[in-house]
């Protein structure tokens, strides 16, 4: 009946009875979504929620210790919102939940509220089929009472009670409240369902009450362990209406209670959410929910457990060109921690771009395979640039998840790798992860805290804010540490040079949406800083990528007239000269379109002993 149940939690330590109920309602391979909403003051940016999000994610992770049913998948979520009911409703829509289970503490401090502000507001217009649940333990519930009147929620209550009774091996008493009502309902679906339910083995008693049923329900409830009751609907613009029967049962009876209500149409609810949220709010919300810290994933055993559960393989590619000063320490640090001591990675591979120093020798001496990118897929030619090396690395790397980090890092730490990997293992919806960090700049022998990332701040971020504002929350779009799922990386083109990071970010966003992208704070990165003339050339190439993508979206039509060469100013003694340099990234097609790649992937997918 249900496939995905969302449970918002105020106190995750008390999640067990609600997890038990959700498990009893789900089929095998169903999914429970446990949600914690981080509240941000109404007039503050949602991005402020990023400060508390890691703490709440750690708190939610502890729920796994309360959950032991291997048939059901448990996923924990932390989301930010200006209001609790808003955050819950948005998550229902975004996650495609088909049942919302609202835990209720059993009382409210507001006399004019039945369940409390948040639940009452959600029940006014439920975003999907909804339960309000009061219980400390469902394991001992063996006798259910279902009072029904044939109203619009009767069939839902009957279906729910039937499924729950079947899972818990409980008996059901159906109490038909045949009270006269000024409102006319078509009871034929209810009566048809009632006839079918007579033959259900868990139905033990069928009672009919005439007149006012309130006291009959209260009296009968004393002989049962659980009461499941449907809300009553009526048109009332100022609020929702559960009806006096439900209100009295909720207030006077301390038995475990489930109140059910069905929604307005999903289309109407979704349209209301879309109208109420601005672009800036969507970006702020993404920033808070999809920005992680590497120390959230420092428990490597837990990452390994997630890897095994998902049955994925993981590759680390190290693009290199004359990096003999740093590549040895990078390989030793990562290999010892993430391959030798604990097999989180399945392979580490160096993708060299024809280095003339000892880069290749150092890597091979440390037992790491080295491929020269000019020799990969030679029938497709070769271009200069890091993007070319990354594109070709897709052909030689074997993993389902592919990570890349630069090889000029001087303060390498395993967290540069497991930080990128964590969100991909933790959140199935995340498909691409970017790193960000503090970037000190070295001037002479002095190391300054500021500086670094100059092309990012002067070129990439201004262009993103102007033309792709949905990506304006990406802190360092040009960072060289990133990774993703093969299934998405093989479906997008790669620019061959400086534009590779920009192109990937825009193309993955256009294809999969902002929610598929995450970023991770990798703390501090010390590396070799480039000269201003080199950064100028980098900016020139990156701007061309922006223009390529803008033209494809019909925002501008200038590319055919754009000059692809750049005049570089060179000092010569007391004078200057101009040097012309052609700076243009080539664009490699999606790797999935390359026949040799497809053949190689298909051969790996064949079972052992299969004919080729």
Q: Where are these predicted regions, by residue range?
A:
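Small/aliphatic-rich secondary-structure junction motif
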Residues: 1-53, 64-77, 142-207, 226, ...
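Acceptor/aglycone-binding surface of glycosyltransferases and processive sugar-polymer synthases
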Residues: 378-386, 412-486
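Terminal low-complexity segments of carbohydrate-biosynthetic enzymes
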Residues: 279, 526, 530-612
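Gly/Ser-rich helix-loop-strand patches that form or flank binding pockets
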Residues: 4, 19-24, 90-140, 221-273
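A conserved acidic beta->alpha catalytic loop
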Residues: 352-360
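N-proximal low-complexity "stem/linker" segments adjacent to membrane-targeting elements
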Residues: 273-336
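Short aromatic/hydrophobic "clamp" motif used to bind/position activated sugar donors
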Residues: 402
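Cell-envelope/extracellular polymer assembly enzymes that use nucleotide-activated donors
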Residues: 313-315, 347, 508
């Amino acid at each position: 009946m249900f496939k995905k149940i969302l449970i918002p939690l105020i106190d995750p330590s008390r999640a067990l009875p609600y997890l038990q109920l959700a498990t009893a309602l789900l089929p095998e391979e169903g999914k429970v979504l446990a949600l914690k909403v981080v509240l941000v003051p109404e007039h503050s940016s949602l991005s402020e929620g990023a400060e508390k999000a890691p703490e709440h994610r750690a708190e939610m992770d502890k729920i796994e210790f309360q959950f032991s049913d291997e048939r059901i998948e448990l996923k924990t979520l932390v989301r930010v919102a200006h209001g609790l009911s808003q955050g819950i409703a948005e998550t229902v829509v975004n996650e495609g939940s088909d049942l919302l289970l609202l835990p209720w503490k059993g009382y409210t401090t507001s006399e004019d509220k039945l369940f409390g502000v948040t639940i009452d507001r959600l029940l006014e217009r439920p975003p999907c089929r909804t339960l309000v649940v009061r219980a400390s333990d469902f394991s001992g519930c063996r006798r259910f009472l279902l009072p029904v009147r044939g109203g619009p929620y009767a069939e839902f209550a009957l279906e729910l009670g039937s499924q729950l009774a079947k899972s818990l091996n409980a008996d059901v008493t159906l109490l038909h409240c045949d009270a006269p009502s000024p409102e006319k309902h078509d009871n034929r679906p209810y009566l048809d369902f009632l006839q079918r339910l007579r033959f259900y083995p868990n139905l033990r008693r069928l009672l009919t009450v005439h007149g006012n049923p309130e006291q009959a329900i209260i009296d009968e409830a004393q002989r049962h362990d659980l009461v499941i009751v449907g809300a009553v609907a009526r048109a009332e613009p100022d609020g929702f209406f559960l009806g006096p029967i439900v209100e009295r049962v909720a207030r006077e009876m301390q038995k475990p209670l489930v109140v059910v209500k069905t929604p307005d149409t999903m289309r109407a609810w979704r349209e209301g959410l879309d109208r109420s949220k601005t672009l800036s709010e969507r970006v702020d919300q993404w920033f808070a929910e999809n920005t992680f810290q590497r120390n959230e994933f420092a428990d490597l055993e837990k990452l390994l457990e997630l890897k095994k559960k998902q049955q994925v393989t993981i590759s680390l590619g190290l693009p290199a060109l004359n990096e003999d000063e740093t590549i040895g320490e990078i390989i030793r640090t990562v290999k010892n921690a993430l391959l030798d001591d604990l097999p989180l990675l399945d392979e580490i591979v160096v993708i060299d771009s024809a280095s003339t120093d000892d880069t290749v020798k150092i890597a091979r001496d440390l037992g790491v395979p080295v491929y020269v990118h000019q020799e990969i897929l030679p029938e497709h030619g070769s271009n200069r640039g890091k993007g070319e090396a990354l594109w070709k690395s897709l052909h030689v790397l074997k993993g389902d998840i592919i990570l890349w980090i630069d090889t000029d890092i001087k303060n390498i730490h395993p967290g540069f790798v497991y930080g990128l990997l964590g969100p991909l293992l933790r959140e199935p919806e995340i498909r691409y992860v970017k790193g960000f960090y503090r970037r000190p700049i070295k001037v002479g022998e002095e190391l300054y805290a500021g500086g670094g990332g100059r092309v990012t701040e002067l070129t990439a971020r201004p262009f993103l804010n102007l033309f792709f504002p949905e990506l304006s929350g990406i802190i360092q779009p040009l960072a060289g540490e990133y990774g993703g799922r093969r299934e998405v990386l093989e479906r997008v083109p790669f620019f061959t040079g400086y534009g590779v990071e920009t192109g990937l970010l825009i193309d993955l966003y256009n294809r999969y949406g902002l929610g598929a992208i995450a970023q991770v704070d990798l703390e501090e990165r010390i590396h070799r800083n480039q000269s201003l003339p080199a950064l100028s050339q980098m900016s020139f190439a990156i701007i061309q990528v922006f223009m390529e993508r803008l033209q494809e979206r019909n925002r501008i039509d200038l590319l055919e007239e754009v000059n692809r060469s750049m005049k570089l100013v060179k000092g010569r003694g007391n004078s200057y000269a101009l040097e012309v340099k052609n700076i243009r990234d080539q664009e490699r097609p999606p790797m999935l379109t390359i026949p040799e790649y497809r053949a190689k992937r298909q051969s790996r997918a064949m079972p052992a002993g299969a004919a080729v």
